[in-house]
Amino acid sequence: MLGHNILTLGECDELDNHIVMCSTGLLSPQEDFSNVNAGHPNNEEAICSLCDKKIRDRFVSKVNGRCYHSSCLRCSTCKDELGATCFLREDSMYCRAHFYKKFGTKCSSCNEGIVPDHVVRKASNHVYHVECFQCFICKRSLETGEEFYLIADDARLVCKDDYEQARDKHCNELEGDGSNKRPRTTISAKSLETLKQAYQTSSKPARHVREQLASETGLDMRVVQVWFQNRRAKEKRLKKDAGRRWKSSNRAESDSNSPIESINGQSPNYLYLDHPMDDGNESNYLFHSREQTPDKYYRNETPSTDPPPMHMTTPSVLTTNFSTPLSLSTNVYNLPPPESQLIPHMTPQYI
């Protein structure tokens, strides 16, 4: 019988038994026996961990202490054979590209993972593939130095021209005779109860929660969003009214030497909400999004002056906020995989 060498995925870095990355090396049988606790392929105990068949190939692949046929060691996504390296997570093996696509940092537009050596675009805290960095209305790619607007809720991007057209059209509708205004929305008692229960859970629900509420109540997404905005504004107004009534009551009823902030020597007992009531905090950085036709997607929340647009500049580290032009990075943005470590000689440099 032919002699066998063992092709082993040797020392593996492991984190919480979830993710490991290994590299392969060709060892002689004697070297392999001194480093791993597994039988030689000539031995009856050499069994492939995937197909449960004896390994009689010239080379044997070892991953995390387990033996495999070289033909069985494949990426669970693309089914290609794994060569020099592989990634292991939850007993599934992946090639480098598909591991990062599935478990790496996600593109804010397509929600797919980004491979570390790919060039990316960055706006605020959001990262995009270069091909995904485009206006979601006209689908035109945004170039370096171009002004654009960022929607806070879902990280969508809008070029300056489309935003200004939508804003101007909306302003013209508001200045009209009112004949084109939408009818007032009526919410049924059952739908109202559903919205109230959701409000008790969170006064500022995430987008996917609003989508679920819209599906359950049969209301438009925009209607659900406006209902939550109005509810927060109402509670804020009630809170201010309660404060004014407290001061008035204090002046009328307190005849003791207690402080102004108390009545009959006792501190006021207010119930404060544990979340900010200012609706301005929950608006988009530059505008609100609408769920109707594209030309109604935005409404300028500042009646006096328009907020300054964000700018894409030459590649640089983002240091601006939303009151100043937003920079755009075209640097190679290496993103490490979540909960993973690499062996020292395979460690990429992360920026």
UniProtKB/Swiss-Prot annotation:
Domain LIM zinc-binding: 46-105, 105-169
Residue ranges: DNA binding: 180-239
Subcellular location: Nucleus
Record has Iron as a keyword: no
Subunit structure of this chain's protein: Interacts (via LIM zinc-binding domains 1 and 2) with lim-7 (via LID domain). May interact with itself. May interact with homeobox protein ceh-63.
Described function: Probable transcription factor, modulating expression of helix-loop-helix protein mbr-1 and homeobox protein ceh-63, perhaps acting in concert with ceh-63. Binds to a motif including the sequence 5'-CTAAT-3' in regulatory promoter elements. Confers thermosensory function to neurons. Required for correct AFD-mediated thermotaxis. In concert with homeobox protein ttx-1, perhaps as components in a complex, specifies identity of AFD neurons, acting by synergistically regulating receptor-type guanylyl cyclase gcy-8, gcy-18 and other genes.
Name recorded for this polypeptide: LIM/homeobox protein ceh-14
